[in-house]
Amino acid sequence: MTVRDVIQKIEPRMKKTIEAFQHEIASIRTGKATTALLDRVKVEAYGSQMPLKQVGNVGVLDVHTLSVQVWDKSMVGAVERAIRDANLGLNPSADGQTVRISIPPLTEERRKEYVKLTKKFGEDSKVSLRNHRRDLIHELDKLEKEKAISEDDKNHGKKEADDLVHKYEKKITEMIAQKEKEIMEV
């Protein structure tokens, strides 16, 4: 196993960390309606918990309104309940087979809470990246002990690991700044 092999094994895990962070912050409310707000909503349907997307079409009607076109009319009440119980601060209303969700404007206090939450998710993701770097360095140390790579190769690998972590941490910082801007926009 070479330094390149170790890095190629760890880099996809770092990319997954970035993807998970993107998914995490997509569900944080901004002042605008987005279908990502409802990604985590689970509906009690047919005896099990199902993602909202599996019981209806989720769409954006306008900047402040989402809609869920429920496929099975008997599920409308369950969809309403699931959205209300998801602790998103949303109040859905049924209209035939459609559930409308109006997105209330965020208060200044709530905006600050969401910014803080975004930063917390970002910091958790950065810690995860550093853990991946630690794993990579541990792997390089092991290879050096087994005489599979030289000390120079190990040091070069550590520098590459640091560069990778720096690149992805910078990406996370940019994503936090973008999300903060979206949240604070009135």
Curated annotation (Swiss-Prot):
<keyword id="KW-0648">Protein biosynthesis</keyword>
<comment type="similarity">
    <text>Belongs to the RRF family.</text>
</comment>
<protein>
    <recommendedName>
        <fullName>Ribosome-recycling factor</fullName>
    </recommendedName>
</protein>
<dbReference type="GO" id="GO:0005829">
    <property type="term" value="C:cytosol"/>
</dbReference>
<keyword id="KW-0963">Cytoplasm</keyword>
<dbReference type="InterPro" id="IPR002661">
    <property type="entry name" value="Ribosome_recyc_fac"/>
</dbReference>
<dbReference type="Pfam" id="PF01765">
    <property type="entry name" value="RRF"/>
</dbReference>
<dbReference type="GO" id="GO:0002184">
    <property type="term" value="P:cytoplasmic translational termination"/>
</dbReference>
<dbReference type="InterPro" id="IPR023584">
    <property type="entry name" value="Ribosome_recyc_fac_dom"/>
</dbReference>
<comment type="function">
    <text>Responsible for the release of ribosomes from messenger RNA at the termination of protein biosynthesis. May increase the efficiency of translation by recycling ribosomes from one round of translation to another.</text>
</comment>
<dbReference type="InterPro" id="IPR036191">
    <property type="entry name" value="RRF_sf"/>
</dbReference>
<dbReference type="GO" id="GO:0043023">
    <property type="term" value="F:ribosomal large subunit binding"/>
</dbReference>
